[in-house]
Amino acid sequence: MAKTINTVTVVGAGYMGGGIAQSLALADLKVEIVDVDVEAAKKGLERLLQEAQEFEDQGLYAAGSTETIKANLTAGRTLEAAVAESDFIEEAVFESPEVKREVLGKISEHAREDAIIGTNTSTIPVHVLVSAVKHPERFLTVHFSNPAPFIPGVELVSGVATTPDVVDAVKDLLARAGREGAEVADTPGMVLNRLQYALLKEAASVVEEGIATAEDVDTVVRTTFGFRLGFFGPFAIADQAGLDVYANGFNTLSEAYGERLAPPKLLEENVAAGRHGVKNGKGWTGDFDDETKAEVIAYRNKAYARMGDLLRELGPAPKGKK
C-alpha cells in the first residue's frame, strides 16, 4: 500500500466531496475532483475556488489560502484517468448502498493495486460496500463531517480485511490536513450518528411530551452541556461532574423513564471500584494527581470563558422564520 499519501482523487464534487477536496488541497496535497462527467467536475472546481476566496475574504481562511488551493486542486479528467494516478481515492457520492457500490466498483477497477480507497459514508457499514472493491485490504470508511473545511473530526472504520498500514497512512494524511481521526467499529451509524440521532430522538420526545418547546430544548443544549462538548467528550465531562453523582442521577431517571435511562453497566462498575472521577483522583478516563486536577480545572475554565467570549462576539445564530 501507499505508505505516504501525496496524491488524492475525490469522487463527487458536491458539497461534501468539494469540502473534503478543498481541505486536503489547502494542506498542500495534490487533489483532483471528478464527478458524473468532466464538465460537472470543472464547474465544481470553479465553485470551490470562488468559495475559498469568500472564506479568505471573511477571515475564515488565512491570507493566501485560495492560491494554495488553486495550485493543488484540479479537475478535467474522467474518473478512470484520475484514480489511476492517485495514492488515495475518497468516494463522496450519494448516500445509497447501490450508488456507492457502483462507483466503488469503477474506482477499484481503475485504481492502482496499492492505492487506498475510502468512502465518506455516514451510516452504511463497510461490510455492506466492500464487495464492490478489489483487494479489500485497502478499503475503509473515512467519514468527514459537514462542513468539511471547518470540522476537524473524521471517523475511520476498518473492514475485516483492512490492514493496519492502510489506517496508519490515512491517519497521517488527516494529521497533515489538521484533522483528527478516530477509529470506530463497523456498525450502522458508527459513533457520530448513533449519538447524534439518539440525542435528537430524546429531544423530540421531550417536545412530544410537552416538557419544553423545540426552541427551549435547543437553548438548553447549546448553553449547558453542548457548550462543553467542543472541549470534552461525555466520559471526560462525567469525570469532572463525579461518576457517583451520575450514577445517582441515572437512578432517579430510571425510576421515571424505565430501563432506557438505567445506569450504564460500565458506570456502575467504575463507581463500585471507587472511581468517582477527578474529585477523588480516579476517573473513567484515567487517574488524576493534584497537578493534573489543577490543569484540568484551569483548562476547563479558560476554554469555557473563551467560548463565552466567542458567542458574545458572534451573537445569536440566525433562525428560520415561522
Where are the language model's segments positioned?
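A non-catalytic, amphipathic alpha-helix used as a structural packing/dimerization or gating element
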Residues: 40-50, 165-176, 216-219, 223
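Rossmann-like NAD(P)-binding element
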Residues: 39-40, 56-117, 124
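NAD(P)+-binding Rossmann beta1-loop-alpha1 motif at the extreme N-terminus of oxidoreductases
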Residues: 1-54, 58, 110
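Hydrophobic/aromatic beta-strand patches that form the interior of the parallel beta-sheet core
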Residues: 32, 76, 90, 140-142, ...
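Rossmann-fold dinucleotide-binding core
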Residues: 116-186, 190-194
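Helix N-cap / loop-to-helix initiation motif
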Residues: 37, 62, 163, 212-216
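NAD(P)-dependent Rossmann-like dehydrogenase/reductase catalytic/cofactor-binding core
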Residues: 2, 176-186, 209, 214-322
